[in-house]
Amino acid sequence: MADPSPEIKAVARYIRMSPYKVRRVLNQIRGRTYADALILLEFMPYAACEPVRKVLRSAVANAEHNNGLDPRDLVISKAYADQGPTLKRFRPRAQGRAYPIRKRTCHITIAVRPIEPEAATAS
């Protein structure tokens, strides 16, 4: 039997931003509806909001196009940022030394699902 509420996801890979900074934004939108999350992302003062907004719009577009779901009925079920490969650079310092610079990347994953009808009537 098919799952009545499928999860539709979108992934952005190799985003040139630290996963710690992206997780700070994802923790705020997890569990919220699509409309609430868009409003939050628009007014939060973090640079990580732009790539997260793009992935969220992509996940909702996937739900609309592939599953025929209404964006107003979608809630963010999963949102996480995994660490990607680190670009290693070196900063020259005095007396022949060099300090390492780690340019971190991350993979952002957002999954949306329709709001459960029994959960909406119970509250």
UniProtKB/Swiss-Prot annotation:
CDD domains: Ribosomal_L22 (cd00336). This protein binds specifically to 23S rRNA; its binding is stimulated by other ribosomal proteins, e.g. L4, L17, and L20. It is important during the early stages of 50S assembly. It makes multiple contacts with different domains of the 23S rRNA in the assembled 50S subunit and ribosome. Belongs to the universal ribosomal protein uL22 family. The keyword Cell division does not apply. One of its GO terms (biological process) is translation. Keywords: Ribonucleoprotein, Ribosomal protein, RNA-binding, rRNA-binding. This is Large ribosomal subunit protein uL22. It holds the Pfam family Ribosomal_L22. GO terms for cellular component: cytosolic large ribosomal subunit. Part of the 50S ribosomal subunit. The keyword tRNA-binding does not apply. One of its GO terms (molecular function) is structural constituent of ribosome.
